[in-house]
């Protein structure tokens, strides 16, 4: 079995990396510190947003980020809320960037 980073460690490292780049990011929902899945919401500060989740690519055998949903921010927030109801261990990180 390949060793894996804990979700808590990965989230802290990701936030530190964003902070070094002067990109605002916040944990809006803490999940399971060991094995919780991580969802990243990108708020583009124009009323739009995208949500990304990590997935396993069976063809390459690697983990990739896929778009869960995108559109008006309230719709993205509703999709994230549905995901949280289905997965209480889910971490949610919100990133604010116009890019």
PLM segments and residue spans:
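Polybasic/polar functional segments that serve as interface/processing modules
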Residues: 1-99
């Amino acid at each position: 079995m390949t060793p894996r980073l804990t979700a808590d460690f990965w989230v802290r490292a990701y936030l530190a990396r964003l902070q070094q780049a002067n990109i605002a990011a916040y944990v809006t929902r803490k999940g399971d510190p060991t094995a919780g899945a991580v969802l990243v919401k990108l708020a583009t500060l124009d009323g739009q947003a995208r949500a990304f989740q990590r997935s396993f690519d069976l063809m390459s055998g690697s983990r990739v980020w896929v778009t869960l949903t995108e559109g008006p921010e309230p719709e993205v927030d509703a999709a994230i809320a549905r995901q949280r109801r289905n997965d209480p261990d889910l971490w949610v990180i919100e990133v604010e960037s116009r890019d």
